[in-house]
C-alpha cells in the first residue's frame, strides 16, 4: 500500500513537465495566490512520502516555476511601463497644481484674517485715539516701518549681488533667511499683510531666478562630475526636484550622443571592436547616470521610474544603432561569430546594470533577436549547401578526423571515431555553429532555435546519405534533388550508417551540451551529470536525432531486401512458384535452403563482418541493423498477398514437397539469426506464423501435412549443415545418414568455392 502511494506521489510530481505543457503560468500559480494558502502545509503534503530523488525533482520544479514567474512579471512590467509612467507624471502634475492651489488659498486666508484684525483693532482703539497725539503715533509707526524696510532693502540688494556673482550656496542661505524672516513676521504680525505678501512674492521670484540659473548651468556641456551633482542637488533643495532630475538625465544624454558621434567618426569599420566600444560607452554612461541619480534624489519611486524610462530609451537607441551598422550586415553575410561576439559583449555590459535595478535585457532581446535569427538561418543554410557539395565527391571511406581546426580544438573528436570526408566537415561546421550560438542562446533566450536548426541540418544530411544508397527512391523520383555520389559497395553503404550514428549518438550531443537545458560539462560531477542527462527536453532532442538515423537504417535494410527479392529487371525472385513447382517433379529433391535464402545468409554474414569492424563499442546498433534487415525480408513474405494467394487459392496449390522446402527455408533463417544473435522475438513469431499459414494451405487441399513432414530435428540438422557448407566449414560427405542434397547444393558449392 505504501509503495503504491509513493508511486502515486512520484507520478504526480513527475508530471510537472506535463503540467507546464498543459497549463498556463497563471493557472499554475493560482494555488499560491489563494488567501488560505499555507506554505508549510503545501510543502508537507508534497514531501510527506517522497524519497530523496522525488524531493530534488519537486525542488527543481519549484525553482523553475519561480524563474518563470519572475520572468513573466518582468515582461508584464515592461509591457505596461510606459502607461504607468504616463499616469504617474499626470498624478505628479496634479499634485503640484493642488499644492499651488493650497498655497494660494493659505495666502488669501492670511490676507483676509489680516484685514479683519485690522478693522477690529481700529474699532477698539477709536475711543482712545483722541488721547494720543497724532505726531507721536506717526513717529512710532514710522520707526518700526523704517527698520523692516531697511532690512528688506538690504536683503534684496545683497541677494542681487549673490545671484549676479553666481554664488549659489550663499544665495540659497540668503533665501532661507528671507523665508525665515517672513515666517516670523507673519507669526508676530510685525508686517502688514500687503507688505508680507510683497516680501513673499519677491523671495519667490528670486528663488525662481536662482533655479533658472542652476538649470542653465546644468545644461552646459562643460558642467560635469561634482559640479553637475552639486547643481542638481541645489536645484532639488529649491523645491524643483523633478526638473533637477530631468536635467541631470538630459545632460548625460547629450554627453552620450556627443561621445557616440566621436566614436563613429573615429571608426572606419563597424565590427566587433566598434560594438565593444559602443556598448561600453552606452552602458557605463547609464550606470553613471544611475549612480548620480541615486546620490542626488535617493530611492524616490518617482525619480526611479524616470530613470528606468530614460535608461530604456538609451538602450533602445543603442540597440537600433548597433543593429543598423553591425548586426544587419553580419547577419546578411551569415557571420554568426561576429554576431555572437557583439551580442555577448552587449549582454555582459547590460547585466552589470542589474545590480542597480536596471534589467535592460528584454530591450536588447526585442531588437537583436530578428537579426540573430537571420544569422542563424544563414549559417544553417551554408552548412546544408557545404554538406551537399562534399557529399557529391565523398568516396564514403572512413578515416580519423584531422585535428587543428577551431572546432576540433574546442570540442575534440574521440580518437577511435572514424567518419567519411563529408561527415567530418559536417561535424566541424556544426561544432563551430554551436560554439557561436551558445552565448546567443543564453543571452537572448532563443528557446532552442539553435538546437532545432542543428536537428534540421542533420535531417538534411541524413537525406543526402539516403540518396547515396543505390536505387534510392528519392533519386528515382527527383534525380536533380541532390547530386550525391552513390555508395556502390556494402562497406560504403555501411559507412553511411556509421556517419549518421556517430554524429547523432556522440558528436552532435557533445557539441550541443553547452546550450542544452542545464547542459552537462566535463567538469560536473557524475551524479549531477546523470540527473541533467535525464531531463525530458534533452532526451526528446536526442530521440529526434535517433529517428533520423532510424530512417537511414530502414532505407538501408529496404534497399538490400529489394536487391534480394527482385532482379535488376524488376522481376520477383522470391515467389511462390519456387515451392509450388517442386511437387511437379517425380524425383525426391535434394534438401538444401533455397538460393535466395543462401544469398540472404551470405549478405548478412558479410555485413556482420563489416559492422563488427566499423561499429566498435556500438554492437547493439549492429545487432539491430542485422535484425531489421532479416525482418524486412521475412515481413515482405508475410505481407505479400500475391505470394499467399497463389499458395492458398491458386490453380496449383502448395504441395507437401514445397511445404517441406518452405519449412526448411524458414528454419534456416531462424537458426542462422539465432547463432548470429539477431533473432528478435518479433522475427521468431512472424516465422512461426508463416510456417503455420503454409501448413494450413496444404491442409486445405485435403492432405495431412504432418504425415509427410519430417521431425523438427531434421530441419534443424539440415539447416546446420547448410550453414557449415556455406561458411566453408563442412562437406556433404560428412553426413551419410540422411540425403541432404538438394537442387540448391550446386549453388552452395559454387558459393563456397568462390
UniProtKB/Swiss-Prot annotation:
Positions with biased composition (Basic and acidic residues): 528-540
GO-annotated cellular components: exocyst
Domain of life: Eukaryota
GO BP: exocytosis
Region described as Disordered: spans on this chain: 514-540, 734-754
Keywords tagged on the record: Exocytosis, Transport
Subunit organization: The exocyst complex is composed of SEC3, SEC5, SEC6, SEC8, SEC10, EXO70A1 and EXO84.
Alphabetical list of PANTHER family matching this protein: EXOCYST COMPLEX COMPONENT 8, EXOCYST COMPLEX COMPONENT EXO84A
Protein name as annotated: Exocyst complex component EXO84A
Organism annotation: Arabidopsis thaliana
Protein encoded by which gene: EXO84A
